[in-house]
């Protein structure tokens, strides 16, 4: 089923993301490494999963970031030691980000888009999720609802594994992270 899904290509509603690119882009290689990381997680090879996400980072950093959240949360759900390491990693990353924003290389890099900037990106309907029509919200958030419905069905049949639960929570964390960015999107804050 996963192989068949990879043959499909469609634009994810109101985003600039496609389920699969029609050409080879570094994002596709990073996605492949992320998919291998998920496979490693399913086989409880935690450090292999972490290494695969790390290798994906220089290939395409944002794709690797999404897999880091998915796999990182899943590993934290599965393993207490990984949960502690993950919590420490999040704290260290937040401190480094705060320092970089306050006095380091990111100081002053957050900018509010002005009218000229907004005109330049006006055709990019994917940039401002706060302007999405209701159907796009239903389609995009409905994917998470569908995931949890399928998870509930597998649980009811006794087919659910701990890895399934962990990945469902990882996917939920991705959606939560997206939702947390909405105030910045509404304020038209541009990231460096």
Question: Where does each model-flagged region fall?
Answer:
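Membrane-interface alpha helices of multi-pass inner-membrane proteins
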Residues: 38-40, 47-61, 67-72, 90-97
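Hydrophobic faces of alpha-helical transmembrane segments in multi-pass integral membrane proteins
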Residues: 2-4, 29, 33-34, 55, ...
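Membrane-interface micro-motifs in multi-pass membrane enzymes
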Residues: 1-41, 192
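Membrane-helix interface segments
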Residues: 44-49, 81-84
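Short, Lys/Arg-enriched charge-dense amphipathic segments
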Residues: 19, 72-78
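Hydrophobic alpha-helical transmembrane segments of multi-pass membrane proteins
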Residues: 25, 55, 134-138
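Transmembrane catalytic cores of multi-pass membrane glycosyltransferases
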Residues: 61-67, 76-192
């Amino acid at each position: 089923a996963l192989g068949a899904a990879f043959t499909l290509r469609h634009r994810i509603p109101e985003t600039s993301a496609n389920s699969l690119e029609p050409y080879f882009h570094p994002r596709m290689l990073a996605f492949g490494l992320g998919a291998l990381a998920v496979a490693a997680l399913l086989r409880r090879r935690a450090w292999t999963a972490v290494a695969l996400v790390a290798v994906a980072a220089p290939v395409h950093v944002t794709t690797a970031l999404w897999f880091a959240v998915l796999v990182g949360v899943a590993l934290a759900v599965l393993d207490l030691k990984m949960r502690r390491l993950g919590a420490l990693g999040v704290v260290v990353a937040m401190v480094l980000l705060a320092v970089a924003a306050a006095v380091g290389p990111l100081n002053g890099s957050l900018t509010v888009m002005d009218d000229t900037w907004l005109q330049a990106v006006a055709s990019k309907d994917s940039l401002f999720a706060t302007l999405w029509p209701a159907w796009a919200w239903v389609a995009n958030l409905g994917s998470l609802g569908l995931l949890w419905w399928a998870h509930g069905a597998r649980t009811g049949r006794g087919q659910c594994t701990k890895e399934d639960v962990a990945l469902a929570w990882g996917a939920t964390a991705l959606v939560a992270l997206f939702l947390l960015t909405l105030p910045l999107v509404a304020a038209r804050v541009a990231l460096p």
